Amino acid sequence: MAVKIRLKRMGAKKKPFYRIVVADSRSPRDGRFIETIGTYNPVAEPAEIKIDEELALKWLQNGAKPSDTRSLLSKQGLLEKFHNLKYGK
């Protein structure tokens, strides 16, 4: 089972709100997911990003691949922390 960290679209028309979820890569964008690890609101000024660092790092260590969320994770500094954990720096 290939697991991905991706965005699940919520909200109304023209007012998107996203949940950052861990899901099987075969399930649809807004379908089944394993766990919610954060939220992303692009409508707010500035855009609001809330991610549970412990959960995100846990899933990255277990092999979850980030999709479009890579830029959101790097803005929060999570990819750098994961890299340091993985390579022991």
From Swiss-Prot:
Record-linked Pfam families: Ribosomal_S16
Provide the GO MF annotations for this entry: structural constituent of ribosome
- What Gene3D superfamilies does the entry give? 3.30.1320.10
Instruction: Determine the domain of life of the protein's source.
Output: Bacteria
Q: Which GO terms describe its biological process?
A: translation
Report keywords, A-Z: Ribonucleoprotein, Ribosomal protein
The record, for PROSITE patterns, names: RIBOSOMAL_S16 (PS00732)
User: Is the keyword Ribonucleoprotein in the record?
Assistant: yes
Cellular component aspect of the GO annotation: cytoplasm; small ribosomal subunit
| Classification via NCBIfam families | S16
> What PANTHER family does UniProt report for this protein, alphabetically?
30S RIBOSOMAL PROTEIN S16, SMALL RIBOSOMAL SUBUNIT PROTEIN BS16M
Its family?
Answer: Belongs to the bacterial ribosomal protein bS16 family.
Protein name as it appears in the record = Small ribosomal subunit protein bS16
